[in-house]
Amino acid sequence: MQILNGKETALTIREELKVEIDGLKEKHGRAPGLAVILVGEDPASQVYVRNKEIACEKAGIVSTAHRIDASVSQEELEALIQKLNADDTIDGILLQLPLPKGLDSQRCLELIDPGKDVDGFHPMNVGKLMLGLPGFRSCTPAGIITLLERYNLPTSGKKAVVVGRSNIVGKPLAMMLMQYGDFANATVTVCHSRTDNLAEEVKAADFVFAAIGIPKFIKKEMVKDGAVVVDVGINRTDEGLVGDCDYAALEDVASAMTPVPGGVGPMTIAQLLINTVQAYKEHVGA
């Protein structure tokens, strides 16, 4: 079985971007700028933000974290977003989710300038994905497509099953797989908690994308021989971090698979860097 190593791939992408950013900085007088908004003290969010800061620093992107107390009002948070929208040194704005109770995350996401929406969550960018128009794509599904490209695993003409229908992963990934291109053009089925005969649907897939949030949900008997399995899940259990797939059991049947950790997670951050550089280039006219 081939291991789809997201950690190594993300490192390669970061090094490539560093070279590109160095050249752009020399030509345009500044580096790309990313603003990250973190509200409250959710431990997982703090780890994610720190990892993003480290990746930005190593790639040459100027990352500014706005750490805000959970008691912030909706109006104050919206004012910060508007301020960042107007800041010409900021190319990307990332609102770390989830927000504490009492804050309207959808309202905040809709306030972000679509040209700075490097997370790809603004309705305008979601709509552009639906229409097949250029725009920012959600980082996790876009990172998955990038990983498949790097390992030359085209989905064109293949049956792909996405297990999970979240707005962050499942829905946008399904839409990306239905676009035109070698690493799209798939026949896509989306499964979820109400799907009848879910195991049968997964068994028919050439590509399985598991994003359901249940530890080791995808079993060996659910996957056909030679399938490519992409595990989006990150679940904390007594045995440590595990994915949505039973990795050890699937090694006997999958032709290629992402590990957890070290698979999709690093690619999400790599795609954030790619999107931020894209936003920067559009802003400076590169």
From Swiss-Prot:
Q: Which Gene3D superfamilies match?
A: Leucine Dehydrogenase, chain A, domain 1 (3.40.50.10860), NAD(P)-binding Rossmann-like Domain (3.40.50.720)
Gene Ontology cellular component list: cytosol
Per the record, what are the reactions this protein catalyses?
(6R)-5,10-methylene-5,6,7,8-tetrahydrofolate + NADP(+) = (6R)-5,10-methenyltetrahydrofolate + NADPH; (6R)-5,10-methenyltetrahydrofolate + H2O = (6R)-10-formyltetrahydrofolate + H(+)
What's one GO BP annotation on this UniProt entry? methionine biosynthetic process
Q: Which GO terms describe its molecular function?
A: methenyltetrahydrofolate cyclohydrolase activity; methylenetetrahydrofolate dehydrogenase (NADP+) activity
Any idea which UniProt keywords this protein has? Amino-acid biosynthesis, Histidine biosynthesis, Hydrolase, Methionine biosynthesis, Multifunctional enzyme, NADP, One-carbon metabolism, Oxidoreductase, Purine biosynthesis
Q: Which domain of life is it from?
A: Bacteria
E.C. code? 1.5.1.5, 3.5.4.9
Q: Which InterPro entries match?
A: Aminoacid_DH-like_N_sf, NAD(P)-bd_dom_sf, THF_DH/CycHdrlase, THF_DH/CycHdrlase_cat_dom, THF_DH/CycHdrlase_CS, THF_DH/CycHdrlase_NAD-bd_dom
Asked if Hydrolase is a keyword of the record, the answer is yes
Report the pathway entry.
One-carbon metabolism; tetrahydrofolate interconversion
Q: Where does NADP(+) bind?
A: 164-166, 193, 234
Keyword Oxidoreductase listed? The answer is: yes
What is the protein's quaternary organization?
Answer: Homodimer.
The job of this chain, per UniProt, is described as: Catalyzes the oxidation of 5,10-methylenetetrahydrofolate to 5,10-methenyltetrahydrofolate and then the hydrolysis of 5,10-methenyltetrahydrofolate to 10-formyltetrahydrofolate.
What does the similarity note say? Belongs to the tetrahydrofolate dehydrogenase/cyclohydrolase family.
Protein's recorded name: Bifunctional protein FolD
Where does this protein come from, organism-wise? Maridesulfovibrio salexigens (strain ATCC 14822 / DSM 2638 / NCIMB 8403 / VKM B-1763) (Desulfovibrio salexigens)
